[in-house]
Amino acid sequence: MAEQVTSAQATAKTVRIAARKIRLVVDLIRGKSVAEAFAILKFTPRSASPVVEKVLKSAVANAENNFDLDREDLVISKVFVNEGPTLKRFRPRAKGSASPINKRTSHITVVVSEKQEG
């Protein structure tokens, strides 16, 4: 007998925002219901908010379309941010020298699952 799937996930790879900046936003929505998370993200004034909202929307769509889960019963069970590849650039400085510039990227993963009864 096949086991009932109760979670779905979505990932955004190589997002051009540093992981530590995205983690500030992600920490606000961990463990919340999907509706509450969308409300929090809508009013969070950070550049990472729309990106995290897009990944969350994708995870909810995956849950509804692929696994027939109800949107009202979904909570964010896991959400994490990993560092992606770093783009290394150089900025010219005085006296012919140069300083390194690291343009950091991130991978965002959101896992939504059905609320546990009880």
From Swiss-Prot:
HAMAP family hit by this protein: Ribosomal_uL22_B
Name of the gene: rplV
Molecular function GO terms recorded: rRNA binding; structural constituent of ribosome
InterPro entries: Ribosomal_uL22, Ribosomal_uL22_bac/chlpt-type, Ribosomal_uL22_bac/org-type, Ribosomal_uL22_CS, Ribosomal_uL22_sf
Subunit structure: Part of the 50S ribosomal subunit.
Any one GO biological process: translation
GO cellular component: cytosolic large ribosomal subunit
Its biological purpose: This protein binds specifically to 23S rRNA; its binding is stimulated by other ribosomal proteins, e.g. L4, L17, and L20. It is important during the early stages of 50S assembly. It makes multiple contacts with different domains of the 23S rRNA in the assembled 50S subunit and ribosome.
Recorded family membership: Belongs to the universal ribosomal protein uL22 family.
Origin: domain of life: Bacteria
Identification of the protein by name: Large ribosomal subunit protein uL22
Keyword flag Membrane: no
Keywords noted in UniProt: Ribonucleoprotein, Ribosomal protein, RNA-binding, rRNA-binding
